A protein has these predicted regions:
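Short histidine-centered beta-strand/loop micro-motifs
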Residues: 21-23, 41-47, 64, 70-71, ...
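Short acidic-glycine-tyrosine-enriched beta hairpin
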Residues: 66-82
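Short, conserved beta-strand element in jelly-roll/cupin
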Residues: 35, 46-62
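Short beta-strand segments in beta-sandwich/barrel cores
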Residues: 40-42, 58-63, 77-78
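A short, N-terminal "cap"/entry segment at the start of jelly-roll beta-barrel domains
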Residues: 1-32, 42-43, 113-116
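Ligand-binding loop in jelly-roll beta-barrel domains
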Residues: 82-108
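Beta-strand-connecting loops/turns
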Residues: 38-39, 83
């Protein structure tokens, strides 16, 4: 199933995540998400800089530029190039993922996010 079909299917709804934590140390930004229910979609979005997403608990399906990247089971690291739209769907309950952004040299004060 592609991310566009998921976003249009009433069975799959974009939901606010119960827990998001932000930490910044020496220009490294970490955004940690806890996704309590499977089938929850972390909305498609894009950043102007490359980053990695660490799946630390559970499993997700990932998309990049509307094409599936496949299933990732914890522990897993997903590299997201700059300017690539990406999204995640929890395949299990209690997924924990962390996005790590190195902003050194980018001139940004925080990770810029544009949702679609």
């Amino acid at each position: 199933m592609d991310i566009d079909a998921i976003s249009k299917n009433p069975k799959y709804k974009k939901t606010d995540l119960d827990y998001v934590e932000f930490v910044e140390v020496d220009d490294i930004w970490v955004r940690s998400y806890t996704i309590p229910k499977s089938k929850t979609v972390l909305a498609q979005h894009v950043h102007t800089h490359p980053h990695v997403t660490l799946i630390s608990h559970g499993a997700v399906e990932a998309w990049q530029d509307d094409e599936t990247m496949g299933r990732f089971d914890a522990p897993a690291v997903i590299t997201i190039p700059a300017g690539k739209k990406h999204a995640f769907m929890a395949l299990t309950d209690d997924v924990v993922l962390c996005c790590l952004h190195n902003l050194r040299g980018t001139g940004l004060e925080s990770p810029e996010i544009k949702e679609f």
